[in-house]
């Protein structure tokens, strides 16, 4: 099944409109049902996860320049604040082309400095509200300098082995999930959902709740005596 993202895809960066949902997350997921192959996809070869033992991982794939990622970010952020304690959520920036890499590295520099909470939303705002160009290392470093991160320090981290490794692993994870558009969600290395499957960004989180429960049940079954 070919996936075409509701927002920005690797094949096309055209924008598309999306609707809203008024039903509670679990209620709508259960009411409409979630079907493999339509509402979500099962990954043939499980993708690697970084969640602590016993936790279920949810990965948000995004790109700072994507307008729909900008719109989805508050939804995902609100969702993470209400997620169950056995769920571990993280973000990973995609790089469909080489020119995506500067913003991919930007995220990991912020992560290395412990400034994601402070500056992640400000990056989106700079691009989509202030219309700043943050496409190259120099442009991004100049912006970071205005946020209190000295340009030299930013570029040192930007070009560091640590950030290079994180960027490479991020792209590998993107490929493992066969992500071809953003925003999208990977669940516990086994499932993938997005606007294409779920039809709206809100419902992609509803489907994610359903897949978390599926993962929880599978983990519980594996933990029973005699299972391996």
Segment roles from a protein language model:
Residues 57-60, 71, 75-78, 101-105, ...:
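Extracytoplasmic/secreted proteins, especially bacterial periplasmic and envelope-associated proteins
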Residues 2-98, 213-228:
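Extracytoplasmic thiol/disulfide redox context detector
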Residues 82-144:
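Structural microenvironment flanking redox-active thiols in thiol-disulfide oxidoreductases
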Residues 31, 136, 159-160:
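Polar helix-capping/helix-linker motif
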Residues 65-68, 95-99, 126-129, 162-163, ...:
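Solvent-exposed loop/turn segments at secondary-structure junctions
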Residues 62-65, 80-83, 110-114, 123, ...:
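Sec/Tat-exported extracytoplasmic proteins
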Residues 5, 146-228:
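C-terminal cap of thioredoxin/glutaredoxin-like
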């Amino acid at each position: 099944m070919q996936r075409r993202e509701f927002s920005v895809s690797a094949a096309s960066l055209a924008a598309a409109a999306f609707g809203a949902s008024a039903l509670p997350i679990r209620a709508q997921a259960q009411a409409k049902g979630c079907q493999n192959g339509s509402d979500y996809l099962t990954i043939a070869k499980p993708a690697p996860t970084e969640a602590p033992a016993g936790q279920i991982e949810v990965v948000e794939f995004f790109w700072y320049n994507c307008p729909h990622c900008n719109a989805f970010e508050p939804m995902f952020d609100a969702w993470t604040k209400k997620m169950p304690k056995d769920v571990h959520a993280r973000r990973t920036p995609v790089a469909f082309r080489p020119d995506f890499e500067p913003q991919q590295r930007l995220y990991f520099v912020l992560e290395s400095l412990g400034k994601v909470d402070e500056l992640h939303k400000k990056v989106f705002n700079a691009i989509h509200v202030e219309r700043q160009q943050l496409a190259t290392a120099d442009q991004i470093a100049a912006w970071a300098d205005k946020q209190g991160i000295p340009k030299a320090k930013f570029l040192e981290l930007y070009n560091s082995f640590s950030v290079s490794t994180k960027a490479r692993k991020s792209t590998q994870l993107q490929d493992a999930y066969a992500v071809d558009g953003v925003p999208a969600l990977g669940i516990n290395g086994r499932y993938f959902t997005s606007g294409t499957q779920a039809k709206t960004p809100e419902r992609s989180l509803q489907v994610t709740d359903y897949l978390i429960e599926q993962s929880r049940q599978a983990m519980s079954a594996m933990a029973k005596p005699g299972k391996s």
